[in-house]
Amino acid sequence: QESILRSLVGARRVAVASGNQAGKDWLNARVIIWWLLTRAPAVCIWTGPTQRQVEIVWRECRMAMTQARKPLGGTALEIPHWKLADDQYALGFSTDKPYQIQGHHNANLLAIITEAHGVDDEHYNALLRLGPKLLIVTGNPLTMQGFLHDALHQNRDLWVTHTISCLDTPNVQQKRVVIPGMMTWEDVQDRK
């Protein structure tokens, strides 16, 4: 994950292929916080195939905010919304209508698609039309079509790409639970 975070500086598009329980949502949450606290004005929007997926990222954001050494400021609501100022906020949502993505314009716009393999190309294109300064897509490479597949394969030259293997997570490497909630050695054995 460290190499992914380092690659964000100066990147325009980042695609992360990952297995289940490998830390994608943890990573996305830290990127959201970093983005808003290092730029002003700044807007971060994130979406996914379901509101539940959006709320998982939000839960990770709230946990990171709670565990921060110093208060991060702003107002963090129960819904996926963190507001530092009128022109400095993070908002997560899921929609079945691509046109509802419109309206979030900012010179420092970060757009994230979590579980991107489950989001259709129309939603991806709606996000692109916002002109994000940085676009991050994360997901399980489960399908042989769609924008995530294209980013990882035929359009790879337009993206900074990364892979997080479940086999590289601390719990699997150390064969014990180091980080609760991540893939475990037992999980890997069960799937053989």
Predicted regions and their residues:
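Phosphate/NTP-binding elements of NTP-utilizing enzymes
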Residues: 1-192
